[in-house]
Amino acid sequence: MLGSGQSRYRMVVAMASVMLAGVFWNGPASARIQGNCGDCHTMHNSQGGSPMTFDTDAAPNNNLLRGTCLGCHAQGGSSATVNLGTDNMPQVMHTGGVDLAGGNFAYITGLKGSGASDRKGHNIGPLTGTDAVLYAPPGGIVQFGHDDGLNVNTNNLSCAGTNGCHGYRYSSRGEGIGGSHHRNVDGQIANPTEPADSYRFLMGVKGYESGDWEETVSSSSHNEYFGLTAPVALGCSNATSCHTSDGAGVAPPDGTMSQFCATCHGNFHTVATDSSDGIGTDTMSPFIRHPTDLALPATGEYAQYTVYDPASPVARTGSVPAAPSGTVSPGSDAVMCLSCHVAHASNYSSMLRWDYSQMVAGGGQTATAGCFACHTTKD
C-alpha cells in the first residue's frame, strides 16, 4: 500500500522546494499568496523542451498549475511549515516535532510516529495509499449514496473538490479550489460565501483562523471553532440540508465544523431521522452515539472545564469570536468533532488526539486530558 503512494508523493515533492523558492505567502491579515506567477503556473507546460511540472510529468495540470496540493503542502520535510521568504507555508506531511492543528498524514505512512496504520487518518491515495479495510466513510448517514461509498470512498478521496474537503465540492480537484489562494482571508470568518472566505477553505464553515495554523499554540492563542448548543436532524431536502440552494454545492447548513464533518459521517452527528438512528431521538442523554454541536452542561463534572485546552478544543456558539479566548464557558461552549479528533491524521487510531486505550475510568490518574477534559470526575 505504501510503496506506490509514497513513491508518487516523493516524486512530486522532490523538486517542489526548488521550484517554489520565489513564492511568498502574505501575512495573517490577508493570507493571500504573493510572488512570481511562474513559480506556481506554466502557460504551456514547456520550457527548453522539458515539462514545467514539479514532477517533470508531460501531462499538464488544471488551472495551468505546475503541481497539485501535495507539491506545496506535503513536502515531507523536517518542519511543520516551509519558509518562503516573508512567511511560511503549512505542511500536512512532515517529520517535525510539532504538528499543525489539522494533524499530520505522516503518521499513516509511518514517516513519523509509532508505526504505519491506515486507521490513523484520512487516506489520500496519492499521498498515503488507499485504506486497506474501509471503503465507505464510517458513519455515513443512511440515504442514497451516503452510507455505501457510492459518492465518496477510499479510492476517490482527495484533498479538494467533489471527493475532498477543501473548496467547492461539486467540481474536480483543480476547479474546486481554483483561485482561492489569491482571495484568502484570515482571522474571524463569520460570513463565508466562497472557499476563499471560509474557514481553511472548507466551504461554508465559520471560525477564527490562527495565523500560524497553531504551530505555536496555548490556551490564549489558537483557532476558534463555531458550533451549536444542540444538534439538528440532517438530510438532503429539509431545512437543515447539506446541499445548498445558492449554487455553492455541499456545505454545513449552520456553518459549524461538526456539520461539515457530517456531510460524510452524518450518522455520527444527526439527531435521528426516518432512515438514520444518529445520536438518538433527541438532544438529551442518554445518547447512542457521542453527540457533537451540543453545549457542555453548566453543572456537574462539566462545569469544571473552564480553562481552554488546545488538546481538547470546544466550539463557540452564538457568534464567531473575533479573537481567541482562554476561557471555556459550560452552558454555551459546545463539544464538537475536533474536541476528540484531528482532521488529517494523528499518532492514534481513529485520528484521536489521545490514546483511547489509556483512558481508564476510576484509575486515579487525576488526568485533565482526553475524555477527562470534559468528564472531569470520572478519572
Positions of the model-derived regions?
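Residue-level signal for the start and early helices of compact helical domains
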Residues: 15-16, 28, 283
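A motif-centric signal for short, conserved binding hotspots located
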Residues: 32-379
